[in-house]
């Protein structure tokens, strides 16, 4: 009943919905758009993704520091929203034609735009709304659930629209960006509050200091969580980059594969949303560290399992996505707020969970692209899966806070 009356919960919930609706028009079908519409090779696709990662590196630490400096002011979100309105014109009239003229130039321009609005923009939005959730007393994970639903609905719609005319998908994204602007306009985060609450969310500018933020890098636990991100989260993102092309290869035609991919993505994201609703309760019970380890375990199963040979197996493995993302996202913020000062939450999130991941992806994307061409998707996925399992096991001992062994001991003591 409380959530029904919490205006900011609905405003930011629907902001997540439409933002990830736009992302759903881009991310799942981007490899297909590159390969089937623009006839880009697997190797060149790796270069494009590497450029996106490169420019994301420039924006993510800046966005992190800027987000903590701005607190709950919406300046950065306005810039991201304005660029999203240009989603369709950019893809249709700028990015696509440039890729045909010069692959490197197109990759650089695309990397700047996509790195800004998605790879750096998405975590900046998540970090902002996580701060707003603490100010407005609602669970971040439940607001983030709207994003899963938005992605799911768009994936199904875009899967159909893409096979009719791929440009329809991009115009749909630009239209949704206009709705984002309206939601941002009417959301209210600057209401009067006590200094205690403002400090808790890092809303006071005096609570933020660049010098203190840089002091974070002297803490070993920051580097250890970064090790988890590079070895676990980064490996998964590299795996997912060209998974759509691997998925469609199991079907008679590319159009059939694209449609089925859209349906499966929709089903997975709707299930993802249902898990996301309960994720805060589970993560609060098991702790941030265990949530991250659980996400790593599920992702490892999916990657290694993709060394499969039938469409049914690939469909089943695709739906595992519904479990991994809720525990990764909610778990990472739980870990950050329990192990570090909350006034630096955005900086830590965008540097550790985003910047270091993108840094590793510059090299891993190119390496994965070469593996896809030399040993095929299945062989490459087996290699990525082994890397993932190794780093998940290492993280059991390197991440701070109560781990799985502490959880087992606690259960045994309760049983006694």
UniProtKB/Swiss-Prot annotation:
Cytoplasmic side: 1-13, 67-75, 119-144, 188-211, 284-290, 337-347, 400-416
Localization, UniProt: Cell inner membrane
Keywords of this entry: Cell inner membrane, Cell membrane, Membrane, Sugar transport, Symport, Transmembrane, Transmembrane helix, Transport
Reactions listed under catalytic activity: lactose(in) + H(+)(in) = lactose(out) + H(+)(out)
Site (Substrate binding and proton translocation): 269
Family matches, as CDD domains: MFS_LacY (cd06172)
InterPro entries tied to this protein: LacY/RafB_perm_fam, LacY/RafB_perm_fam_CS, MFS_dom, MFS_trans_sf
Membrane topology note: Multi-pass membrane protein
Family membership: Belongs to the major facilitator superfamily. Oligosaccharide:H(+) symporter (OHS) (TC 2.A.1.5) family.
Record-given protein name: Lactose permease
